């Protein structure tokens, strides 16, 4: 089980400053959102996806999160169509999570 949880611990550590500034009841939501963003990055870096983009195949990765409280999918605006926008899209998506008002 620890191997499965290692990735979420990495996300928690990488974004510790952002998460530490949130109230306890918002921290889990933000952690889930950041995890989705990080996993889109991981998928984008796989050989299969990289090769597809190099061949010019139309392939788009999307990052969405499911809300357990409301049953709605939330678009995290982590949409990647190639390596040329990967870092910029990542930074923008993380900034959006950081700036999202949490009621």
Task: Show where each model-derived region lies.
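Divalent-metal-activated hydrolytic enzyme cores
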Residues: 1-103
């Amino acid at each position: 089980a620890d191997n499965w949880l290692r990735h979420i611990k990495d996300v928690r550590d990488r974004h510790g400053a952002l998460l530490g500034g949130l109230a306890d009841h918002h921290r889990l939501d933000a952690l889930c959102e950041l995890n989705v963003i990080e996993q889109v990055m991981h998928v984008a870096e796989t050989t299969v996806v990289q090769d597809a983009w190099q061949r010019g195949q139309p392939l788009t990765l999307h990052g969405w999160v499911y809300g357990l409280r409301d049953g709605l999918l939330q678009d995290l605006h982590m949409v990647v169509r190639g390596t040329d926008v990967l870092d910029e899209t990542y930074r923008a998506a993380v900034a959006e999570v950081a700036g999202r008002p949490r009621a």
